[in-house]
Amino acid sequence: MAAVAADPAAAAVPASAEDRETQPEAMPDLDQQWRQIGNGRERPLRAGESWFLVEKHWYKQWEAYVKGGDQDASTFPGSINNSGLFEDQISWHLRERLVEGDDYVLLPAPAWNYLVSWYGLKDDQPPIERKVIELPGIRKVEVYPIELLLVQHSDMETALTIQFSYSDSVDLVLQTAREQFLVEPQEDTRLWTKNSEGSLDRLCNTQITLLDACLETGQLVIMETRNKDGTWPSAQLCGMNNMPDEDEDFQGQPGICGLTNLGNTCFMNSALQCLSNVPQLTEYFLNNRYLEELNFRNPLGMKGELAEAYADLVKQTWSGYHRSIVPNVFKNKVGHFASQFLGYQQHDSQELLSFLLDGLHEDLNRVKKKEYVELCNGAGRPDLEVAQEAWQNHKRRNDSVIVDTFHGLFKSTLVCPDCGNVSVTFDPFCYLSVPLPVCSRRVLEVFFVPMDPRRKPEQHRVVVPKKGNISDLCVALSTHTSVAPDKMIVADVFSHRFYKLYQLEDPLSGILDRDDIFVYEVTGRIEPVEGSRDDIVVPVYLRERTPSRDYNNSYYGLILFGHPLLVSVPRDRFSWEGLYNILMYRLSRYVTKPTSDDDDGDEKGDENEDEDVEDDSSSEEEKEEMSGPTDNDGTQESEQEQAGTSSGVTGRCPSLLDNSLHTSQWPPRRRRKQLFTLQTVNSNGTSDRTTSPEEAQTQPYIAMDWEPEMKRRYYDEVEAEGYVKHDCVGYMLKKNPVQLKECIKLFTTVETLEKENPWYCSSCKQHQLATKKLDLWMLPEVLIIHLKRFSFSKFSREKLDTLVQFPIRDLDFSEFVIKPKNESAPDLYKYDLIAVSNHYGGMRDGHYTTFACNKDSGQWHYFDDNSVSPVNENQIESKAAYVLFYQRQDVGRRQSQTASSETPTSPASSSTPNSDIMDVN
């Protein structure tokens, strides 16, 4: 593709003479030059103004010249020379990746004009003029404008590279293309863009900026000229078959149009599809009634821009000519006014819906100047009178199609618990956020580790109260294991260490479903109490020595492995040798003890070392503390093993009860094989330090350090990881479906305010935790019900996947509305479902879709981004239902009568060619 450069900003400015002698005599003195240029640089940025780039080297030389104060100095800079900023002196393209302050300085137009008039511009260089543009939240000089490749539909091989500002309108691109390609004034033209995927998008709105149109440097823009016979030559364009949603021959049902996912924007698509299928709101935009009510001066609004963007979207989706559309213009408009929706992160469809309804209301508010309105005082007055006054006050400041369609009225009653003072207010609402009845129980999956080493750990599923404590978990597990709750310690194990050791009073809400929870059978306490005779429970880690990568260094690293242990040790018999023996006993299921043959084989050739050990009895106690314990001779060990094994449930090794093991003479004449050494460590399993047994009682974490060869020969990793499943593992907590009316009843029940949100009682003159009750007083034409599926607490976040059963027709609110009933108009309280926003997945990720009933056909459809398919009514109810849209029956009946009396014009019956469709056939 041939590219022809054309930079409309590159017109040369008449320059003064290049040398100092030809400078005009009107050049001011140096101080005045410095003041004029320096003051100009401090000028604030204003959108649309021109600034100019000056090469940093020339500017610094000029700066030194004027600061020197000598007008005849040799530092005279000469003509402005920006050659270092250009790639070459033919195309005059700006070099890439120039940095302000390092490569150039920016000057506003007045300062630039001064310098040019004083010093001139070298070699007929074009001035580097750039515009100030306004981006969301910031103004900046657009040093690198957008470069677009303009082509004609009749010649896709020859492209013109044209620079534009991101703040320029699409219409400027169109007019530039018409000028460059010599299009006659009477000829019709339109633009298309080719995106990175190769498909083409129609640039329908020519009044928006290139930034809002999401155009990028290097993007291909195609100008299409209408044929003389009135048709468009779109079919001849390269790549048209990549646009299945832009088919001029496609004539479908209005409203059955998908929305392309721009990247995690399914939440937006779902909210838009629901709102688009609210009949009275869509008719309001399709019939252009919104044009008469746009409020451009509302300081709380978006200058009408959000309403206009939504109107364009509705008109496209209800034109009947699109299978799907790309809502990038609307997305950019939302991000422009609500920074939380900038980018392409996942958000909540209900949050976007709330912003959209509020934004549309303010953009379409019929009240141009809001007056101050005092709050109603309902003390001692009839509810009917107070409610009517509250609604009238609301309408005096808020009057729009959104209020007409979606706003209702609450009655809020607060009662002081001390003096009984009652406060009644009536407040408007736009939607109901109703809680789901939460199950008071939860199922926890835990591993029970018995003291008997012959038994493998057991996997259990226990039912516990959601708001219970760790003690409730121990009681529930006790029914499965027959172990007393006070003989259990609950731990969160993560990465081979104890992440947390729980106290009995700790809340269960601190345990997440993904946590690995181990419950250990013990006979004592972890934190010793002075004077207590209880056993000490010692946390024990397993570590393997690994050679350092520096082979000239004798240092060995240590890596945790396996599951940590909690070992009960008698307080008055705590010793290294006793701890070693009890650990050997606890590990006996998956650790093989060395035999006499192993000892003999390993000690051959080392007799001299054994003799040294035997003779050095005077220093044996010191060695014991430094290197950890060794084993007893074969006879004594065997007796202790048998006693330990026969101790049964206590799991307590009798060797700890033998006073002789606490003396310094316990090592035998001949040392036996030592499988591991013991070290005191911190809770992370690090920070080794030599510690006496007495000190170990105050720093109870112990590590068993294994040599790699010892671990390989004697430690059975497969057996160590083994466990059995208890019969309760298959238990699943049954979740019964919930009726929508149960949620509404829960919404209207009395609740006590939380400590973080007290109420100020005008009678007590204090903040009180009052009781609060909400009642429905007046319902809107379209009632939006938000099911609060997402639960947040201090320790956890979860999504409730409870099935909420809701009626498609005849949802009767008469039992919830406390306003005196109009018996002659029962339809005022009955509603029919028209749309559902669904959420699939969990808290961190998920996907939004929509069920919606077409206002013209009455057929339900499933909208999944750009995919749309018809569905039966029995498919609508699911656990994914998140936001429900109900329409009052009297409104629906009135709309049906209006529609039947009118003759709709369908796309199929229209003979006028659609100017927004590109033929792909």
Curated annotation (Swiss-Prot):
The active site is at residues 266, 847. One of its GO terms (cellular component) is cytoplasm. The modification Phosphoserine is found at residues 596, 692, 906. InterPro entries: DUSP-like_sf, Papain-like_cys_pep_sf, Pept_C19_DUSP, Peptidase_C19_UCH, Ub_carboxyl-term_hydrolase, Ub_USP-typ, USP_CS, USP_dom. Residues 1-16, 895-915 have a biased composition (Low complexity). It catalyses: Thiol-dependent hydrolysis of ester, thioester, amide, peptide and isopeptide bonds formed by the C-terminal Gly of ubiquitin (a 76-residue protein attached to proteins as an intracellular targeting signal). It is found in: Nucleus; Cytoplasm; Chromosome. PROSITE patterns: DUSP, USP_1, USP_2, USP_3. Residues 597-624 have a biased composition (Acidic residues). It comes from the Eukaryota. Residues 257-889 form the USP domain. It is an enzyme of class 3 (hydrolase). The keyword Protease applies. Residues 1-29, 592-697, 893-921 are annotated as: Disordered. The modification N6-acetyllysine is found at residue 194. Belongs to the peptidase C19 family. Protease that can remove conjugated ubiquitin from target proteins and polyubiquitin chains. Inhibits the degradation of target proteins by the proteasome. Cleaves preferentially 'Lys-6' and 'Lys-63'-linked ubiquitin chains. Has lower activity with 'Lys-11' and 'Lys-33'-linked ubiquitin chains, and extremely low activity with 'Lys-27', 'Lys-29' and 'Lys-48'-linked ubiquitin chains (in vitro). Plays a role in the regulation of pathways leading to NF-kappa-B activation. Plays a role in the regulation of DNA repair after double-stranded DNA breaks. PANTHER family: UBIQUITIN CARBOXYL-TERMINAL HYDROLASE (PTHR21646), UBIQUITIN CARBOXYL-TERMINAL HYDROLASE 11 (PTHR21646:SF29). This is Ubiquitin carboxyl-terminal hydrolase 11.
